């Protein structure tokens, strides 16, 4: 078994994430999530992630949802949405297994959506 300290977790990687237990309207269950924290943060045992959910056409008008088409690089099996409104810091222990990585172009869209959600300039 690989120890937590041996896992390399980088911005833009997609990991299976165990969200439970959740409270209220928090997105739950085991699902993909993208690491959005900067690699410059060093070896903290926490990562900032944005959960990924199945795409729904109503998300077309939602500025914080970033559409992702499945491909061999990202490891997703369905058209998906990165929910930047549900961004959170989580223990690396919640990140189970890397399944892929996002393109630089998609990460730029994620950064833009995070800027809107957090009201900060990119």
Where are these regions (language model features)?
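Conserved functional hotspots at enzyme active or ligand-binding sites that engage polyanionic ligands
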Residues: 1-122
């Amino acid at each position: 078994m690989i120890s937590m300290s041996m896992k390399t977790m980088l911005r833009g990687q997609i990991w299976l994430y165990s969200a439970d237990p959740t409270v209220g309207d928090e997105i739950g269950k085991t699902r993909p999530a993208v690491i959005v924290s900067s690699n410059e943060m060093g070896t903290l045992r926490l990562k900032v992630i944005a959960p990924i959910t199945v795409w729904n056409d109503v998300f077309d008008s939602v500025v914080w949802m970033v559409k992702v088409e499945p491909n061999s690089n990202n490891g997703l099996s369905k058209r998906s949405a990165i929910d930047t409104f549900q961004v959170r810091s989580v223990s690396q222990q919640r990140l189970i297994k890397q399944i892929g990585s996002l393109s630089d172009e998609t990460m730029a869209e994620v950064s833009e959506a995070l800027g809107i959600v957090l009201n900060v300039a990119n």
